[in-house]
């Protein structure tokens, strides 16, 4: 289980990682790559790098890239050292955040005068979870929607909608390299809503066949616990593992349902969930 937990966390952190990889059809005169060794199979997605994003709210603010196809004797120059600083160590290019948010271009030159340009973006990183569909409230037992009471349950909770299509959660991490540290939260209930501030925490649910992500969101005097359901557990538009986009978030609201509808008796084993479909992506944001 510990191994599965680490693998899952690693998969999730891949969604937060620095933007590095690109696809190339042919070898360039000078190229950059991530990792220790170049994988340059023509016509495939390799570890070539066409641009870099460095998050200033990360414990790791330096990127170490390999240099391929050059002639040695490298020199590097940043168009704005306040955004990104550069250094050369043999055939490696070191990029370090300069402390200023923005974009810069790194120019690398070899001893033969060949050049390569690398766009770099630095800034505060966040994860945006944007709701694309409000599935709504569903009664579920053993992963199956209970169709016989579906409409009555939905009617009873018709006003429950903490997040709707077009809305989003913006998660500003304390450390983009360590999601478990949590961070600051901005909630936009819909596309026109103003931001409501709060905090979020991240953990893994150790139930079922594999650990699953859980976000505890606290804002506006309320706490909402969103989980990614076990793959195949709930049939919606998106069956999701951790790294599939879009995917489903679910919130167990059985307690709220019973409190608000004391005369409604749920069948044994049935729980009530609020579901949304979301797309996630990394963002560079302006801190207000």
Please identify what each model-predicted range represents:
Residues 1-10:
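Bacterial N-terminal signal peptides that target proteins for export
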Residues 2-3, 23-25:
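N-terminal start-of-domain structural block
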Residues 12-14:
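Repetitive helical segments and hydrophobic/amphipathic motifs
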Residues 18-22:
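C-terminal motif of bacterial Sec signal peptides marking the signal peptidase cleavage site
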Residues 24-287:
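Extracytoplasmic soluble-region selector
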């Amino acid at each position: 289980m510990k191994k599965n937990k680490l693998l899952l966390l690693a998969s999730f952190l891949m969604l937060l990682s620095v933007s590095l990889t690109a696809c190339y059809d042919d070898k360039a005169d000078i190229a950059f790559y991530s990792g220790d060794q170049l994988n340059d199979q023509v016509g495939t997605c390799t570890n070539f790098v066409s641009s870099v994003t460095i998050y200033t709210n990360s414990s790791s603010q330096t990127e170490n890239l390999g240099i391929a196809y050059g002639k040695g004797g490298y020199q590097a120059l940043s168009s704005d050292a306040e955004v990104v600083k550069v250094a050369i160590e043999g055939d490696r290019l070191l990029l370090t955040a300069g402390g200023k948010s923005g974009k810069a271009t790194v120019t690398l030159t070899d001893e033969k005068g060949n050049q390569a340009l690398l766009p770099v973006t630095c800034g505060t990183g966040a994860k945006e979870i944007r709701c694309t569909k409000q599935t709504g409230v569903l009664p579920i037992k053993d992963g199956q929607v209970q169709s016989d009471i579906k409409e009555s349950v939905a009617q009873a909770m018709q006003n429950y909608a903490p997040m709707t299509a077009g809305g989003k959660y913006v998660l500003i991490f304390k450390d983009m390299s360590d999601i478990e540290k949590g961070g600051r939260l901005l909630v936009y209930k819909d596309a026109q809503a103003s931001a409501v501030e709060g905090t979020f925490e991240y953990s893994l649910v150790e139930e079922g066949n594999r650990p699953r992500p859980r976000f505890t969101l606290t804002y506006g005097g309320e706490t909402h616990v969103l989980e990614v359901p076990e793959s195949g557990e709930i049939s919606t538009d998106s069956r999701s593992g951790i790294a599939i986009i879009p995917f489903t978030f679910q919130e167990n609201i059985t307690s709220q349902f019973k409190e608000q509808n004391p005369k409604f008796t749920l069948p044994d084993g049935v729980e009530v969930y609020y579901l949304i479909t979301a797309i996630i992506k990394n963002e560079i944001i302006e801190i207000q």
